Amino acid sequence: MSAQQFKYLFTPIKIGPFTVKNRIMVSPHGPLMGELGLPTEEFIHYEINKAKGGAGWVCMSVGYTSPRDTWFMRPNGGHFDRHIWTWQKEIIPGFKKIADGVHEYGARCSFQLYSINLGNKKGPSCIPDCNFADQMWEPMTKEDIKEYLDYHRICCENVMAAGFDGIDIHNHSGVCTDFLSASINKRTDEYGGSLENRARLLMETIEVTRKVVGKNKAIGYTLTVDDLLPGSIVPDEAVQLAKMLDKDKKVDYMFCGVGRETQSMHMYFGPHYLAPAYQMYAVEQIKEVVKNIPIVAVGRINDPLLAESLIAEGKTDIVAMARPLIADPELPNKAKEGRLDDIRPCMGDNLNCVKYMMDGQPIRCICNATVGMEHMGWGIGDMKKAATKKKVVVVGGGPAGLEAARVAALRGHDVTLYEKAKELGGQALQAEMLPGREEMGGLVRWQKIQLPQAGVKIVTGTAVTSDMILKMNPKPDVVIVATGAEWMRNAFSGQSTAEVVGWQQDNVFTPSDVILGKAKIGKKAVIWDARQDITAIAIAEILADKGCQVEILAPTPFVGSLDQIKDVT
C-alpha cells in the first residue's frame, strides 16, 4: 500500500476545539518513568518521542490524584513512586517541557487521571478489597466524595497550567469504575441503585473537569464496555452510559474497550494469543449509538493497514495504540511515507512492557532496545555516525546479534555477521513454533529486511572459531559475540540453582527437544516450570494435542506468567 492509499488514517479530525492532524492516538499507559511522583527527563523524552514519530494525539498516564492513592506502594517505591503524583504543583515545569515538545511536532497532548478509591481503603460499599480479599473496603462518605472531587480539580488545574490540551478520565478500574459496577456498588443513596445514580460520581467528575478546562480544551473518557466480571459493567449498560455522555457532548472523545486492570487483566493487556483488534465487538456497539463525539478504538490495533480498514469501514473514528508505538514510535511517519516494511513490529509478548510495569519497573520493549533511553541520545533521528569507521564482526544471528549488526552498520561501520545455522533467527525460530506464538518471529523477520538495507554482510552456515577470527585479513577491530543460550537439561530445583535430581535420565528433555521433535514422549509427561513463563504451558499444549497426559509442577502457586498467560482452563 502506498502512502496515497491511506485515505482515512492521515486525514484530520476534530476533537473538541482542536483539529488533530491524523487519526492515530497514543493510548494512555504508565511507563513508570517518574521519580517520587515527578516527571523525569526519561519520562519527558519518552513522551515527546511519540509526537516526533508522527502520532496526532499523545495521551499520557498514569496520574494519581490523591496522596491516599497508595494501593501500589511497595517498600522500594514501585508503581506509586514511579507514576505521576498529579496533585503536586511541582509536576508543572516537567509537564510544560512535554507539552512544548509535543506541540513542536504538530501533535496534541492530554493526561489521564486515575483515582484508586482513596488509597484503596474505601469504595462504594463495604465489600472485600478486589485485590486483597482479607481486607474490607469502607463505604465512601459524602465527605470522602468531596475530597476525591477536590483533589481531582487540583490535578486538572496543574495539568492545564502546564499547557496540555486535555484531561482524560480513567475507567478501567478506580473509583468511578467501582461506582458504576452493580456488583461492587451496593449503595442505597443517590450514588447507588439505578445506572443514573451509579454514574452520578462520574458525571460530577466530568463537571469538575469541565469547570477547570473550559471549552477551549478537551476531555476524554475511557468507557469500559464490558469488564468481563459477573453482574458488573455489561455492554447494555455501557451503551446507555455512552448515550448519556454523548448528549450535550459531556466529553470530547471516548475510548472504548473491555476488561479491568486487575481481575480481567488478560483481556485488558491482550497478548498475542488474542486476535488483532479483539476489542472491536465492544467498540462497534458504542459507535452505533454515539453521534456527536469521536470514538477511539483500542486493543491490539498493531498494524496501520488494520487501522485504516477499521476507520474506512466506519467502525471507529480514531485508533489508539500503546504497545505498537512502544515497539516503533515512528509507525505513523513510516506508514504515511509508505515504508510499511520498515515498521518494527510489536509481537504482543508483554514481556518487557506489561511485565515490567506490573513489577513496578520502568517499561522496556523486547523489540526496541531504545525505549527509556530517548533522553540519552537514542530518540528518533538522534543516532550519530561513529567518529572512526571500524571493521566489526558479529558472531551469532539471533535477535541480539542481528540488532547489534544493524545498529553498528547504521553508525557507519563495516559489519559482517556470521551464523552457524543456515537460517537467521536463533531461539526466535523455536519461539514462533509454539502454539499461538507465531508473532514471536516478527522481530527477526523485520531485522532480515533491515540488515541488507543497512549494508550488513551476512554469512550463514558458518561456525566461527577463535582461530578463524585471528586469521581474518584485515583483522576486525571489534568482535561482538552474540551466540545466545540453550536450555539447561539439569534445570533448577525451584527457588535455588540446585540441579533437579535425576536430570541425567534418558526420559528428561528440554523444551527445544519437544519443539524440534527430538523428544521421545510416552503417554504421560511431567513438566517442571522452573522458568515461570509461557514456555511450560505451550509445551503442555503441544504434548496434550498429541494425546499425552500432562502434569505441570511449579515453584509458585501458579504456572506460567500472569502477564503473558492465556486461559489455561
Predicted regions and their residues:
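Short acidic (Asp/Glu) and glycine-rich catalytic loops that position anionic groups and cofactors
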Residues: 220-224, 263-264, 425-428, 457, ...
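Glycine-rich phosphate/diphosphate-binding loops that line cofactor/substrate pockets in enzymes
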Residues: 20, 210-219, 453, 470-475, ...
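Rossmann-like dinucleotide/flavin-binding elements
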Residues: 305, 386-418, 459-472, 482-565
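Flavin-dependent oxidoreductase catalytic cores
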Residues: 1-395, 399, 403-410, 414-415, ...
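N-terminal Rossmann-like dinucleotide/flavin-binding domain of flavoprotein oxidoreductases
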Residues: 426-476, 563-569
